[in-house]
A protein has these predicted regions:
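Transmembrane helical elements of multi-pass membrane transporters/channels
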Residues: 22-41, 142, 153, 176, ...
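Transmembrane alpha-helix boundary and packing residues in multipass membrane permease domains
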Residues: 27, 31, 42-43, 60, ...
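Generic alpha-helical transmembrane segments of integral inner-membrane proteins
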Residues: 28, 32, 36, 40, ...
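Helix-terminus/linker motif at the lipid-water interface of multi-pass membrane proteins
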Residues: 32, 36-54, 123-130, 186-197, ...
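Interfacial/gating helices of multi-pass transporter permease domains
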Residues: 45-64, 130-135, 199-201, 241-248, ...
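Short runs within selected transmembrane alpha-helices of multi-pass transporters and secretion channels
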Residues: 74, 143-162, 169-177, 202-217, ...
């Protein structure tokens, strides 16, 4: 009896790691490609000038915030879709996709309008430097086109990932990323007879690649049997699913937007401490993203796998899977820190910044060798484990208090009241992830996050009512 039980547990463990690697590898490749594109942007702009790097880095905060909005909407959609996919309810998945598209398209259109008509106002929030405002405004005006495409593709790709089609999602992103790098080089350096457009060229390249990605999504949708990109899904009405979506998405959206806006406040603080700090931070962000790809891929894959298990009603199994996922994340976080440390000399060798920015760059990179671990563990639990069971409120409360009550006020106080040196301000800002660890681990051990959030006979009940 004991031998059989051991074999059963061993098989379950093997099955978990097999499924995790099947989901994680494409996501890692996708994240690496994304980091590679961002790296290419910064490396190419490095040859244009420090002002171009700084301006694009500040203007890109809007893309980051908007991405977090899409991520929040995609989270609500993918959490529901992952669990309904576990029940093989495709009709519910279509309705959920339609709800997410309604919100993403409306938000994209609003931000695009502001980028078209008031880009200077958007830049003045981050800097008072006239040169940076001018460069960033040209960049934002073109990026408005990107926002319109992005809102549709991010929702569809989130739905594909939620049903386990991570390879297709990876392939579509790969197409956009490779095209982005080629077009960046073309418009920044004036290749193939194109004009040298600098920062504006980066925006044109991004907009073009996102448009191609949208077209590719339409083609994939046409070939798909069930999970399609269909705007008519926006007109599917389900009061129950809408309530469930709002219950999950609003806290997730609020969490992601609150966190991303607060994180952008770090750029506001650094932006008013000088262009050297901004330029150094733009390179550090790229390196940190490279070091974090394994961690965030595990969190994304874990959300899909745990969601499917919970949708089938096996809550105890989901807790075992969550424990294994956390162990994988800790290992990945340690590896990420080593990667950042290992490539620091290479970054220092090829960065073309002035002496002040190079000094900041060196020590900011060292700080991020440990910062990755804090970010990895919190992402795995808050954005992975907890959300897989529909627990999105905890992250909203936890991150809002951590960022807006602790980190952002501390950063402003350190920079503008105590007037501490730039590196001390940066160090204090990078304590944000570790401050919330006790709270996060306590919530994890309680196990209340493990829930089956699907409903039986969903559309039949609505027809009856």
């Amino acid at each position: 009896m004991g031998v059989n039980m051991t074999n059963t547990l061993s098989t379950g463990k093997d099955d978990f790691y097999r499924q995790m690697f099947k989901l994680t590898i494409p996501i890692i490749i996708q994240n690496l490609l994304s980091a590679a594109v961002n790296s290419a942007d910064v490396i190419m702009l490095n040859y244009v000038g420090q002002s171009a790097i700084s301006a694009v880095s500040l203007a890109a905060n809007y893309s980051y915030i908007l991405f977090m909005v899409y991520y929040g909407l995609g989270t609500g959609a993918s959490l529901l879709c992952a669990q309904y996919y576990g029940k093989n309810n495709i009709q519910a998945i279509h309705a959920i996709e339609g709800i997410a598209l309604r919100f993403s398209i409306a938000i994209s259109a609003l931000v695009a309008l502001v980028a078209f008509f008031a880009p200077q106002l958007m830049m003045k929030i981050f800097t008072s430097d006239p040169e940076l405002i001018s460069i960033g405004s040209s960049y934002l005006r073109v990026m408005g086109i990107t926002y319109l495409c992005w809102g549709v593709t991010e929702v569809y790709l989130a739905i594909l990932r939620s049903v386990g089609r991570v390879t297709i999602s990876m392939a579509l992103n790969m197409l956009a990323f490779v095209l982005n790098i080629i077009l960046n080089a073309t418009f920044i350096f004036g290749l193939f007879g194109a004009p040298k457009l600098g920062a504006t060229g980066v925006a044109i390249a991004t907009a073009s690649s996102r448009l191609v990605e949208l077209v590719a999504c339409v083609i994939v949708s046409f070939m798909s049997k069930n999970v399609k990109l269909n705007l008519t899904y926006m007109f599917i009405r389900s009061k129950v699913l809408f309530r469930d979506f709002m219950k999950l998405s609003l806290p997730a959206l609020g969490n992601d937007v609150s966190w991303s806006v607060a994180f952008s406040m770090y750029s506001v603080i650094l932006g008013h401490l000088g262009t050297d700090a901004v330029a150094a931070n733009s390179l550090v962000t790229v390196v940190r993203n490279i070091g974090s790809v394994f961690c965030f891929a595990i969190a994304s894959a874990g959300t899909i796998l745990l969601g499917n298990v919970m949708g089938k009603g096996d809550l105890e199994k989901s807790k075992v899977y969550a424990s294994r996922m956390l162990k994988m994340t800790v290992i990945a976080g340690a590896i990420g820190g080593v990667i950042v440390f290992a490539i620091t000399p290479l970054v220092m060798r090829f960065a073309s910044l002035n002496d002040g920015a190079m000094y900041y760059l060196k020590y900011m990179l060292l700080i991020n060798t440990y910062y990755i671990m804090g970010s990895a563990v919190n992402s795995a639990l808050i954005a992975g484990v907890f959300r897989a069971g529909g627990d999105t409120k905890f992250g909203l409360i936890c991150d809002t208090i951590d960022m807006w009550v602790y980190a952002v006020p501390l950063g402003f106080f350190a920079a503008f009241v105590l007037k501490l040196p730039v590196l001390w301000v940066y160090f204090l800002l990078c304590t944000d992830e570790f401050v919330k660890w006790p709270w996060v681990f306590h919530h994890y051990r309680q196990g209340k996050w493990a829930q089956n959030i699907t409903r039986e006979d969903l559309f039949e009940q609505e027809k009856a009512s």
